């Protein structure tokens, strides 16, 4: 925690000339610092922070008593209770420690499409959520999903390390080939050793999208899925005879875009989103529809708070 003062002082260096594409002003950063990513269960951490841990010892929050046993630390004895009951009791505390915040960014080829660009939107959302975690003195682990793997960046701690997160995000480019999101999610889950909030930012354009949800739910983390779609995907401005090409495989299909076709598309899209939300709810995953037109402030301070992904 000794670095906090330096971290806060250095925030003024987050200027457009130095950081692209994720730039936050002082006011936005201060608002982010008042938030915390929610975890509903006690977790094991490796270093003291402000999260609740299942470890017992002398710390900030008293939780219970138990009978003294030979070898217990005598400093934990409650002598006031002994004076009243003439029995030796050990005071139990819950230590508050850090957790690891896992932020997964889908960088498949389809994420580079849309206006605004879905990948750019995802980077900004990832940076904001990373800062929330860093401001809580949690460890933040960033990973990019491409191909069949999850490429992890070194985990960081402390608000001063937001610069490293921004640099990592700025260096991420969209894949030029096909991405198997379910396989990449499974790859990340297999490497995961510390539980905590886990956020996936993705358009979920994958034939096995439901498996992606299942793979991440299996980590027993507090999983949130930010389903990121562009306006053109939600309401395509198409008309006439067209050839629609898959951005990842290059496969194409000829269509005639008329009112009937577009209505059918919107209906199928709504059914797909509803199905993903249903599967997510069943697996205790927070499903958050996230159009790229949604302002970042509204996403973080309204939508994610409403869905209990973050709290003040």
Where are each of the predicted segments found?
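Conserved, well-ordered alpha-helix/loop/beta-strand core segments that scaffold catalytic motifs
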Residues: 275-308
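C-terminal functional segments of enzyme domains
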Residues: 185-193, 197-201, 208, 226, ...
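Short, electropositive alpha-helical surface patch
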Residues: 155-168, 259, 304-307
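A short, acidic, amphipathic alpha-helical segment used as a generic capping/interface helix at domain edges
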Residues: 211-212, 271-278
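An amphipathic, basic-hydrophobic helix/alpha-beta surface used to engage anionic
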Residues: 2-156, 187, 197-202, 207-208, ...
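SAM-dependent methyltransferase
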Residues: 235-271
């Amino acid at each position: 925690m000794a670095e906090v003062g330096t971290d806060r002082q250095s925030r003024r260096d987050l200027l457009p000339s130095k950081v692209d594409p994720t730039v936050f002003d002082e006011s936005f950063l201060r608002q982010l610092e008042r938030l915390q990513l929610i975890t509903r269960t006690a977790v094991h951490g490796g270093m003291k922070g402000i999260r609740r841990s299942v470890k017992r010892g002398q710390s900030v929050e008293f939780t219970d008593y138990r009978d003294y046993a030979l070898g217990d630390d005598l400093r934990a004895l409650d002598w006031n209770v002994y004076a009243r009951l003439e029995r030796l009791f050990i005071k139990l505390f819950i230590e508050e420690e850090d957790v690891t915040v896992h932020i997964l960014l889908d960088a498949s080829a389809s994420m580079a499409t849309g206006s605004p660009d879905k990948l750019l939107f995802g980077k900004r959302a990832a940076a904001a959520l990373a800062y929330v975690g860093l401001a809580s003195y949690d460890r933040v682990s960033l990973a990019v999903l491409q191909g069949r793997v999850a490429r992890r960046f070194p985990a960081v701690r402390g608000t001063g390390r937001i610069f490293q997160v921004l640099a990592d995000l700025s260096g991420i480019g969209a894949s030029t080939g096909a991405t198997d999101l379910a396989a990449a999610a499974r790859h990340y889950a297999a490497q995961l050793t510390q539980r905590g909030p886990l956020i996936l930012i993705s358009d979920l354009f994958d034939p096995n999208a439901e498996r992606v949800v299942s793979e991440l739910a299996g980590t027993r983390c507090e999983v949130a899925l930010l389903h990121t779609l562009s306006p053109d995907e939600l309401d395509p401005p198409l008309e006439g005879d067209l050839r629609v090409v898959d951005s990842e495989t290059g496969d194409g299909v000829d269509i005639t875009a008329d009112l009937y076709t577009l209505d059918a598309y919107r209906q199928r899209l709504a059914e797909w989103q509803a199905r993903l939300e249903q599967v997510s709810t069943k697996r205790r995953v927070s499903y958050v529809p996230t159009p790229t037109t949604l302002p970042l402030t509204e996403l973080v301070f309204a939508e994610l708070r409403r869905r209990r992904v973050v709290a003040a």
